[in-house]
Curated annotation (Swiss-Prot):
InterPro entries xrefs: CbiA/CobB_synth, Class_I_gatase-like, CobQ/CobB/MinD/ParA_Nub-bd_dom, GATase_3, P-loop_NTPase
Domain GATase cobBQ-type: 248-433
Record organism: Methanocaldococcus jannaschii (strain ATCC 43067 / DSM 2661 / JAL-1 / JCM 10045 / NBRC 100440) (Methanococcus jannaschii)
Free-text domain note: Comprises of two domains. The C-terminal domain contains the binding site for glutamine and catalyzes the hydrolysis of this substrate to glutamate and ammonia. The N-terminal domain is anticipated to bind ATP, and cobyrinate or Ni-sirohydrochlorin, and catalyzes the ultimate synthesis of the diamide product. The ammonia produced via the glutaminase domain is probably translocated to the adjacent domain via a molecular tunnel, where it reacts with an activated intermediate.
Cited SUPFAM superfamilies: Class I glutamine amidotransferase-like, P-loop containing nucleoside triphosphate hydrolases
Signal peptide: none
Cofactors that this protein relies on: Mg(2+)
Pfam families: CbiA, GATase_3
Protein's name according to its UniProt entry: Cobyrinate a,c-diamide synthase
Metabolic or biological pathway: Cofactor biosynthesis; adenosylcobalamin biosynthesis; cob(II)yrinate a,c-diamide from sirohydrochlorin (anaerobic route): step 10/10
Length: 443
């Protein structure tokens, strides 16, 4: 069947993938029902896609998922859409290893048999830009069908690039040329872009502008034409365990906590969980629930506000269900962040550092039954944080880290029977026990 799809891949990081991919999604959304995707484990870029398309963007990751799972997850979310735009990660071929493509944009493109549009930084380049494209085309068996030249300087620069392409690569479509433009910049910080909940109105306005600029400089009809290819469907691929058990889950979601995979919520709902969102910043108490789920984010930027909300802190302390905290959520339920008092459910504190403390795909094994898995089972995830825990008096950890760092001594997931919290970020496919364990733990 036809399932229109295209990967927007870069020759490297910092070539404009997120801005241009999001702009393409926004521009196409005027005529089409668009599904966005991000290659890799990033939380923030998909929230930009979601604003652009009105559909929840998803992650596709060949470390988290095998080829069939990538195809099935894509099929699940794209089957009722007109076209899918998949934003790559880093350079097209960058993955976790120097000698294979696991974790790379190329691996996802190959799993989906998707055409690729290559985004090239053309600053001060003409013939050399063509050499780069030819190298990318010959390196592996991927389908590079078009190119976008970013950071072009002048009409003369554009003419030279056109001449070089027509001479050396006449069969590759030129999708367009984007000039050096301050409007194509996006604000970032240590964990990536600024999350959309922090400055929603301004980011929405930027995305509208990116869509207008893409319409001006790129050939959208060529993008749709390139995307128009057959897709080989797959049937009944295992994504995650389903062991239905009705539970109410309160999920922290606001400016401080917004790092979530929407597929985790899908997996929880398939296991009959009912999800209700609340704000540790603005609300006075946790909703009526069986489980409290506090995901990642930037609590360090809002630590004073979080600390001032004494009613919420007391509500969390008095919560009589199970609590799961992930990275930023872990930090929040320690005694303090940079000496600013927090919830204090865990006997340790969090401090921010100037250097990354964990940046890795993770392989782990459960040491005991807990809120997100069962003893002896292995799972995957990722970690990315600049904080670390100090004055750790906790001695019980739910999982050992086989690849990655964890909290201390290759251990992660502080666990006291009621509270589980760690630095490892879970995706429901990479940890297929996540949702079923959460709704069934303790029974």
């Amino acid at each position: 069947m036809i399932m229109k799809r295209v990967v927007i891949a870069g020759t490297s990081s910092e070539v404009g993938k997120t801005v241009i991919s999001t702009g393409i999604m926004k521009a196409l959304s005027k005529k089409y029902n668009v599904q966005g995707y991000k290659v890799g484990p990033d939380y923030i870029d998909p929230t930009y896609h979601t604003i652009a398309t009105g559909n929840k963007s998803r992650n596709l990751d060949s470390f988290f998922m095998n080829k069939e799972q990538i195809k099935y997850l894509f099929q699940k979310h794209s089957k009722d859409k007109d076209i899918s735009v998949i934003e790559g990660v880093r350079g097209l071929y960058e993955g976790i290893s120097a000698i294979d493509d696991i974790g790379s944009t190329a691996s996802v493109a190959k799993a989906l048999d998707s055409p690729i549009i290559l985004l090239v930084n053309a600053k001060s380049l003409t013939r050399s830009a063509i050499a780069i494209i030819k190298g990318f085309m010959s390196f592996d068996n991927v389908k590079i069908k078009g190119v976008i030249f970013n950071f072009v300087r002048s009409e003369n620069h554009i003419k030279k690039l056109k001449d070089a392409m027509s001479y050396y690569l006449p069969d590759i479509e030129i999708i367009g040329f984007i000039p050096r433009n301050e409007d194509f910049k996006v604000e970032g910080r240590h964990l990536g872009l600024v999350p959309t909940p922090e400055n929603l109105k301004e980011i929405e306005s930027k995305i509208v502008l990116w869509g207008e600029l893409v319409e001006k400089y790129l050939d959208l009809d060529k993008i749709v034409e390139i995307a128009d290819e057959d897709f080989e469907e797959v049937d009944d691929v295992f994504l995650w365990e389903v062991n239905e058990n009705y539970k109410k889950i309160a999920v922290a979601y606001d400016k401080a906590f917004n790092f979530y995979y929407w597929d985790n919520f899908e997996a929880l709902k398939e296991n009959k969980a009912k999800i209700e969102f609340f704000s540790p910043l603005k609300d006075s108490e946790v909703p009526d629930a069986d489980i409290l789920y506090i995901g990642g984010g930037y609590p360090e930027l809002f630590k004073e506000e979080l600390s001032r909300n004494k009613e919420m802190i007391e509500s969390i302390k008095e919560f009589d269900g199970y609590i799961y905290g992930e990275c930023g959520g872990l930090m929040y339920i320690t005694k303090s962040i940079d000496n600013v008092p927090m919830v204090g459910l865990l006997n340790c504190s969090a401090v921010m550092t100037k250097h990354v403390q964990g940046l890795s795909y993770v392989k782990a094994e459960f040491l005991e039954d807990c809120l997100i898995g069962r003893k002896g089972l292995k799972f995957k995830g990722h970690e990315f944080h600049y904080s670390k825990l100090v004055n750790i008096k906790e001695e019980r950890f739910a999982y050992k880290i086989e690849r990655g760092r964890g909290i201390i001594n290759n251990l992660d997931g502080i666990f006291n029977g009621k509270v589980l919290a760690g630095y490892l970020h879970n995706h429901a496919v990479a940890n297929p026990y996540f949702a079923s364990s959460m709704v069934n733990f303790g029974e």
